[in-house]
Design a protein with these regions (language model features):
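Electrostatic cytochrome c docking/interface patches
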Residues: 12-32, 127-135
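The canonical Cys-X-X-Cys-His
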Residues: 29-43, 97, 101
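Extracytoplasmic electron-transfer domains, predominantly the class I c-type cytochrome c fold
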Residues: 48, 54-109, 162-166
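Flexible coil segments in periplasmic/lumen-exposed cytochrome c-class electron-transfer proteins
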Residues: 83-148, 229-236
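Flexible glycine-rich surface loops and low-complexity tracts that mediate binding to linear polymers
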Residues: 143, 204-217
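Short aromatic-glycine-enriched beta-strand elements
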Residues: 148-159
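Short nucleic-acid-contacting surface segments enriched for D/E, G, S/T with interspersed K/R
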Residues: 181-183, 193-209
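OB-fold/S1-family single-stranded nucleic acid-binding modules
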Residues: 212-236
């Protein structure tokens, strides 16, 4: 079952199920995709020398993240091995290609085109709607640092959400101070990933944790990439 706070967040956020691009935009994207992407990813996105862009694995990789993550990846890295002499692709054309990819994955078109402003406000979700982030995702959560049976954990943690950076910015930590705590507990692994961090000095503090989520029955953990104090003591 989707946690209540996460459900409220997604109910307030447009998703790719809501018709966030137009049919005309996807049609333009199809022509651009055929020219620039089809030779590697296949005419029907089935994958040839490069991975498929229209299957469950593709959706699993990108779901529960804002769509600008996929857009930025395509814009900055594709076509792979592009020659400096090859024809340039504009940001708008990259957006069109992404909308075609969405259409081929069965997501509905709407009446309004996707723009550079809107792409970061749309959540990429699976066909069954919002779900907890998948195993192995780089995530961020906020919780209380404590020790249980000799293991460091963050308790009263928020539902983890995807993040793109392994490190925390000052703005993120400041924003975390305003966020309410949750009900989850995660074991922390790889504390040495935070040089100079001494957990004993932050026991009972509200912390922002980033790392790779490992889902295990009754014992979920986060392989740490960064940990920052939000406030002391840890209060809701």
């Amino acid at each position: 079952m989707l946690p209540n706070l996460l459900l409220i967040f997604f109910l307030q956020t447009p998703t790719v199920l809501d018709g966030t691009f137009s049919g005309a935009q996807a049609a333009r994207g199809k022509a651009l995709y055929t020219t620039h992407c089809g030779s590697c990813h296949g005419e029907s996105l089935e994958g040839v020398s490069a991975p498929s862009l229209a299957d469950a694995r593709f959706i699993e990789r990108w779901r529960e993240s804002t769509l600008d993550g996929l857009y930025s990846f395509v814009r900055e890295r594709m076509p792979f091995g592009r020659s400096p002499n090859s024809a340039s692709i504009s940001d708008r054309e990259y957006l069109d290609i992404v909308t075609y990819m969405l259409q081929k994955n069965g997501y509905p078109a709407g009446r309004v085109e996707m723009t550079a402003d809107s792409v970061g406000k749309v959540m990429f979700v699976g066909k069954n709607g919002p779900q907890p982030v998948p195993d192995g995702s780089l995530v961020v959560t906020i919780g209380c640092l404590s020790q249980r049976d000799g293991t460091w954990v963050v308790s009263n943690s928020t539902e983890p959400v995807r993040t793109r950076s392994e490190t925390a910015s000052a703005a993120e930590v400041k924003a975390a101070a305003e966020k309410r705590l949750g009900t989850l507990t995660f074991r922390l692994a790889d504390l040495d990933a935070a040089p100079g961090f001494t957990p004993e000095m932050h026991q009972g503090h509200k912390m922002q944790v980033k790392g790779y989520l490992v889902r295990q029955p009754n014992s979920e953990r986060i392989n740490l990439s960064s940990i920052e104090m939000v406030s002391a003591p840890c209060v809701r």
